Amino acid sequence: MLFCLASASGKTVKNHPFVSIADSILDNVLNLYQTEDGLLTETYPVNPDQKITYLAGGAQQNGTLKASFLWPYSGMMSGCVAMYQATGDKKYKTILEKRILPGLEQYWDGERLPACYQSYPVKYGQHGRYYDDNIWIALDYCDYYRLTKKADYLKKAIALYEYIYSGWSDELGG
């Protein structure tokens, strides 16, 4: 919604009522879901008996997760980029660069090539790497590069596209 408003008008929407709602949600997620090591939890409140039933292939994981999976964590990047783009408020740039991106780097798998983000922080072992998760992050890096002109963000987007293109196949259904 904020992106549409900003795109249509060509201006920031700092005073739009949805901005304060989005800002409040962002603050609450950062405050309620944060972990000591700069990540976010998968759920709030943390339930020690939680069963994760939405894993690939119908697998189920029992017990407490130490952090969120990549997909919900990367949504924080999308939100911060969108809020920065919509408002121009450097608060979102600071949150992104000081909290979200450092946490996101804990998912970076540089051991398996081409490098990309894996589905769970690397310090907890090897986990799945998914093209769809990485494409959303690559798009966010492209948007953020466009806003900041910082070459590191473009380089990260290109690295992610190298991973994504590595999965290309001309086989039907492949």
Question: What spans do the regions from the language model cover?
Answer:
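Residue-level marker of positions within ordered structural domains that often coincide
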Residues: 3-6, 81, 142
